[in-house]
Amino acid sequence: DSYIAFHGNDCYFGTAAKKKMGTEGYQVVYELKRVIGLDEDDESIDEDKEKWPFKIVGNDRGKACIQLELPFNGETITRTVDPEVLVAQYLNHLLEERVENRLRCKAVFTIPAKFSNVQREAMKSAVNQLRLADVRFFPEPTAAAMAYIRESPSIVDNSCIVVYDFGGGTFDVSVLRYSH
């Protein structure tokens, strides 16, 4: 669960953050992938803005940012944060739990095939904040095809692999030709 919950100076991630939904004094954000790299007035998030318990505001460049209302010492502090920063914070939390030496860590990140170049660059910006040794980015269906090839020893040289991704209202396709 890609949830982050804030309460004063405290921060919770994943399931622990999701459990804070609706709890007084906690600000919970999620679905950051739907916001990252977009302009504040992008129509693709208009419906989402109505259901999210957090506000989307524009920064000085018109980019969509998350506005947090955080209780602190009896007052409410308003903080505006770029989605890239929050994505990096979430990924950083995951790495702290699982990776001993980041400077040796190799990682593959998948990016939705429907992302624009601006959204892809925003995701790369978030990941680059993690200071990993070797990072690769692939569209989600391409990564699925590569995983299929890796896990299928029966694939012969010069095979054609087609992966259809029917997720989330999109229809994405990757076609790969495999050769040793």
State where each predicted segment sits.
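Short, well-ordered amphipathic alpha-helical segments that serve as non-catalytic structural scaffolds
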Residues: V87-R98
